[in-house]
Amino acid sequence: MEGPFDSLPGVVSVTSGYSGGGVRNPSYEQVSAGGTGHRESVQIVFDPTKITYAKLLDVFWHNIDPLDNDGQFCDKGSQYRSAIFFHDAEKKKLAEESKAAVAKKLGRTIVTDVLPASEFWPAEEYHQHYYKKNPVRYHFYRFNCGRDQRLAAIWGSAPAH
């Protein structure tokens, strides 16, 4: 999920990590085992004078499967379920409105959760910008998981940003 946001003007930083669980400073091994209550997530720092939260939400929706309650693509389990973690009432409102708009557009129930942000724990360094550090491996993973094919099936010709 870092790549689509990294390239956007106004995005200051994108950090892979874990949100929503009860274990302090969890490791990838703990989170991927599914017992911490965390979800794999990205933290996006942005300049609101250069990019809107609504634009970030649009990019988010076009890069996930909002219909899959079991995870994302070939990553299954509650730790891979999609969510938007909000930090204030305005962002909650915008996230819920965007979710409703996506549901209307797709004519389906959207299973992505909109949740209050809890402490964000950065993932280990080898996870940061994995797609840049390991481009061949990332491309292989993305292709074999059917990510691009599934996004095209959901969104049609709309760009995945």
Predicted regions and their residues:
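Flexible coil/turn and secondary-structure edge motifs
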Residues: M1-H161
